[in-house]
Amino acid sequence: AYLGGSHQLAGMKWYGSNIENKEKGLPRSILMMMLNDKDTGAPIAMMSANLISSYRTGGIPGVGARYLARKDSKVVSIIGPGVMGKTSLAAFMAVCPNLETLKIKGRGSKSIENFKAWAKAEYPQLKEIIVCTDNEEAVRDSDIVSFTTTVLNDVSTFPEIKEEWIKKGA
């Protein structure tokens, strides 16, 4: 990809992903970025792209919330309390300053508790953090709902919600 403007660089991001990495103490996705001189192709930088990719991915739902969420949104639900959940919540908090309740739904108690502690420290303006036991509890009465989950290749593991759970205007 060519970056014009003041950057005048070419670059690419390499994405490697394996759901079994977690068992090895590694992140599911391992990303690298290479930047090159636009004229010569000479490498200028090779670096980890995990952080920049996480914020780019989390920023996308933030852009959606900026333009589509109700301005008086108070309740946000994150289903999937991992890295993408964190960057998505960061984006939501930036564009929806009235958020005061966070609902969390996850598969493992460790990731839920880590996310809860992080959210409390990072966003003291949150008045309430609720850990939900199922998707219905997480979705009902939420103004913003974000699924940041990893699923296996089996469609039966895909998260599911019902229309009647969705708050009017959410």
Regions found by a protein language model. Name each.
Residues R140-D141, L152-A170:
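Rossmann-fold NAD(P) dinucleotide-binding segment
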Residues G80-G82:
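Glycine-rich Rossmann-fold phosphate-binding loop(s) that bind the pyrophosphate
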Residues L68-V75, N98-L99, K167-K168:
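Short helix-loop-beta connector
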Residues K127-E137:
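Short acidic-hydrophobic, aromatic-tinged amphipathic segments that line or gate anion-handling sites
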Residues G85-K86:
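N-terminal Rossmann-fold NAD(P) dinucleotide-binding loop
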Residues A1-R56, I60-G62, D72:
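N-terminal ligand-binding/catalytic initiation module
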Residues S146-T149:
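Short, well-ordered coil/turn residues at beta-beta hairpins
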Residues V95-Y123:
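NAD(P)-binding Rossmann-fold cofactor-contacting core
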